Design a protein with these regions (language model features):
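Pre-Walker A adenine-sensing motif
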Residues: 2-3
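Internal, well-ordered alpha/beta segment that forms a basic, Gly-enriched binding/recognition surface
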Residues: 89-200
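Extracellular cysteine-rich, disulfide-stabilized repeat modules
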Residues: 13-16
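Charge-dense, low-complexity intrinsically disordered regions
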Residues: 202-388
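Metal-centered catalytic cores of metalloenzymes
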Residues: 40-47, 52-55, 119, 182, ...
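An N-terminal structural lobe/cap that precedes and organizes the functional/catalytic core
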Residues: 6-11, 28-135, 140-141
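Extracellular repeat turn/loop positions enriched in glycine and acidic/polar residues, especially those
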Residues: 18-20
Length: 388
């Protein structure tokens, strides 16, 4: 997009508030409906409004069978994954229920940071995005009482990928709706170039994800579990963290650029990392239509030394995904320096994210031809796979 258009809302385009009216006839000349707060930057106020927003819905495509009660559904299974990581009923994760920490920088700018916090297992990774019936029925094959993960079972792989996608989709949907409500209350926000850029990004992301949701919806209704290409990495032992993500990594295991964007459309992976009693898994899935994008990457992951694969995910996951659940056993095993580094990386966004993403590329470049030396205690500052 032309930089001028990226940072500016034009009169004839639809108003960002979602009214369906032209911007010039809607929010352009409207006054804010509440008093300005000059003590805090508009970006900080916007972040707090977004975090406080709630939205209840059922994202299953069969609306005819929905019930009224929308439950706190778990993105990662409480009784099979989170409970395995927990100590005294708690795990560590980013707690977006609390206000962000506001940090002034040396340049006089403001950064926000969400701290890791102990969260009860019944609240960890929950979202109000499924009704009682659909949450219970759709994911029954991987929930409590179901057999252990079977890497030859297409239904298992589909359900993990679908969960990773749909819970990330819900988060973006909440962001979009909260942003629209914020614009209705405070149209002056659109005078911020940063907020206009955010609006452009979230709008494009929703268009991309709506297309993928339509594909998952059709597959869910037809019980068609063959729409995905899945890379399964089995790791000996039970790891101390879990993760779900819908992301598009920029670099592969050998620092080559992954061409994940074509014609302006990003093609994402649906990732789940989880422990079982005596083994753990990393699942990476993409739509079959995207298999050419990730074919070489999948091949690298399945043929490389498992410790080098761990090193890659140690670098990539904290940078790309905020949905990492840490066992208290792992968190307390880390030094304060490691805890601080993890918190820093998982909060990166904007320019700083781009800088450290490039740093990840150089880190992988330096060990491109290295096949050993990635054992426990040798992989780097953040060791998600450390034995505790």
């Amino acid at each position: 997009m032309n930089p001028l258009k990226y940072y500016r809302i034009f009169d004839e385009e639809p108003c960002p508030c979602g009214s369906g009216m032209k911007y010039s006839l809607c929010c352009k000349k409207r006054e804010d409906s509440f008093q300005r707060d000059n003590k805090r930057p508009v970006e900080v106020q916007a972040a707090e409004i977004l975090k406080k927003s709630q939205y209840k819905c059922c994202l299953h495509p069969d609306k005819s069978r929905c019930v009224k009660h929308i439950k706190e559904a778990h993105a990662l299974q409480n009784n099979k994954i989170i409970s395995l990581l927990s100590e005294n009923g708690h795990v560590y994760m980013l707690n977006d229920k609390k206000p962000p920490l506001i940090i002034p920088t040396e340049k006089g700018e403001i950064e926000t940071s969400t701290l890791l916090d102990k969260v009860g297992v019944n609240r960890a990774t929950t979202a109000t995005c499924f009704c009682d019936i659909h949450d219970d029925e759709v994911f029954a094959a991987i929930e409590k009482g179901a057999p252990a993960f079977d890497k030859g079972n297409n239904e298992h792989k589909f359900l993990y990928a679908y969960k990773a996608f749909i819970f990330e989709y819900y988060k973006k949907l909440v962001e979009q709706k909260a942003f629209q409500r914020m614009i209705k209350a405070k149209p002056s926000v659109l005078k911020s170039r940063m907020m206009v850029a955010y609006y452009r990004d979230i709008s494009l992301t929703m268009r991309e994800m709506d297309t993928v949701k339509d594909t998952f919806d059709k597959a869910t209704l037809a019980n068609d579990y063959g729409i995905l290409q899945t890379c399964v990495i089995e790791i000996p032992g039970s790891i101390g963290f879990a993760n779900y993500a819908c992301i598009a990594p920029d670099y592969d295991l050998y620092f080559r650029k992954i061409k994940n964007t074509k014609n302006g459309i990003m093609h994402r992976l649906y990732i789940t990392v989880f422990p079982e009693e005596n083994r753990s898994f990393i699942l990476l899935s993409c739509l079959h239509t995207d298999s050419k994008v990730y074919k070489d990457f999948f091949q690298q992951l399945q043929t490389a030394n498992v410790d080098k694969v761990k090193y890659y995910f140690d670098l990539m996951l904290p940078l790309y995904s905020e949905n990492i659940i840490i066992s208290p056993r792992l968190w307390e095993h880390w030094t304060e320096e490691q805890q601080a580094a993890f918190t820093f990386y998982i909060n990166l966004h904007g320019h700083l994210f781009s800088v450290y993403r490039l740093g990840m590329k150089f880190a992988m470049q330096n060990c491109r031809n290295q096949t050993t030396g990635f054992g426990d205690g040798k992989r780097g500052k953040i060791d998600l796979f450390a034995k505790t």
